[in-house]
């Protein structure tokens, strides 16, 4: 089984109760293997940076024009033509937003961290959720991957509300 290389950067002031490098690696690995439909996907490197609200706010404002911090930002790395590099991109995850959302949604913190690592990895692989059909496909993949890891459907609360 191929193991992705994860460069885990902790830029958050409070680093208590954060997932371990092994956890992030497992979550990203499962997303990559699911996408490749094989356990032996190409060598891949991803940077995961855990930040506080101030950095998330600045990045979200600069790159998305959104005047607030967000849970996860994905920055795919575009390798210049003719160069072979295993870099997939960077994920920026805001600790405070993750904790707040997990509490509001009444889900485990570990489950929400896993979901956002998987969600961000799928963005790095080219998935998006701007159009309804894209969102449905991406949410379906996230649900399959999360359930394969023993977590519940991350969108279950939204589905209950819709019914």
UniProtKB/Swiss-Prot annotation:
The gene is ybeY. Zn(2+) binds at residues 119, 123, 129. NCBIfam families: rRNA maturation RNase YbeY. It is found in: Cytoplasm. One of its GO terms (biological process) is rRNA processing. Single strand-specific metallo-endoribonuclease involved in late-stage 70S ribosome quality control and in maturation of the 3' terminus of the 16S rRNA. Its cofactor is Zn(2+). Its EC number is 3.1.-.-. GO terms for cellular component: cytoplasm. It comes from Actinobacillus pleuropneumoniae serotype 5b (strain L20). This is Endoribonuclease YbeY.
